[in-house]
């Protein structure tokens, strides 16, 4: 049954991943194109699709459902291609939807390959959470990147009962995220709770000491 899934879904997953990538990055700006020569002539790839073939995924925007669906599809496809070889995720994200981010996080934890997380630019909020969720020993950051953690943000309007429901959900998400951060960093939950009350910025070296990452990339 597993082989059938891989064979029947592989083509759909890669087409879905590439289409989502193209859609997302077209909204950001012009995407460089790579021309490859083959026995059948030239073939053009956008740079992100080409890097996907090298098991490199980019999270270079805010996190929403579309971004989440694209990353999950790519992770599943790369696992189907090779369940043993590492997958790299480069993160430059201000964060975004907690539920969309948790979909990416859960997939990272469930697939067989180790997921290498690399911060370039900034990994803030849910971006920092995903950075910390990479495989132990394989969570990295470039020297001048910035990392920020804080509690979930949210707003509610409507009747008092509806506001109360939303407030309970935000508190639940806060408890869940902080517990997982404590697990990934090795910090006491009380310290995580205190530090995330406000925006808490760290340099890469500080993030290593905190346990959010394992190493700063240097030449």
UniProtKB/Swiss-Prot annotation:
Family named by the database record: Belongs to the peptidase S14 family.
Assembly notes: Fourteen ClpP subunits assemble into 2 heptameric rings which stack back to back to give a disk-like structure with a central cavity, resembling the structure of eukaryotic proteasomes.
The protein's role, per its UniProt record: Cleaves peptides in various proteins in a process that requires ATP hydrolysis. Has a chymotrypsin-like activity. Plays a major role in the degradation of misfolded proteins.
GO cellular component, one term: endopeptidase Clp complex
Keywords: Cytoplasm, Hydrolase, Protease, Serine protease
InterPro entries for the chain: ClpP, ClpP/crotonase-like_dom_sf, ClpP/TepA, ClpP_His_AS, ClpP_Ser_AS
Active site, per annotation: 125, 150
GO molecular function per UniProt: ATP-dependent peptidase activity; ATPase binding; serine-type endopeptidase activity
Broad class of the protein's primary localization: cytoplasm
Protein name: ATP-dependent Clp protease proteolytic subunit 4
Gene of this entry: clpP4
Disulfide topology: none
Pfam families: CLP_protease (PF00574)
Catalytic activity: Hydrolysis of proteins to small peptides in the presence of ATP and magnesium. alpha-casein is the usual test substrate. In the absence of ATP, only oligopeptides shorter than five residues are hydrolyzed (such as succinyl-Leu-Tyr-|-NHMec, and Leu-Tyr-Leu-|-Tyr-Trp, in which cleavage of the -Tyr-|-Leu- and -Tyr-|-Trp bonds also occurs)
Subcellular localization(s) per the UniProt record: Cytoplasm
E.C. number: 3.4.21.92
Gene Ontology terms describing biological process: protein quality control for misfolded or incompletely synthesized proteins
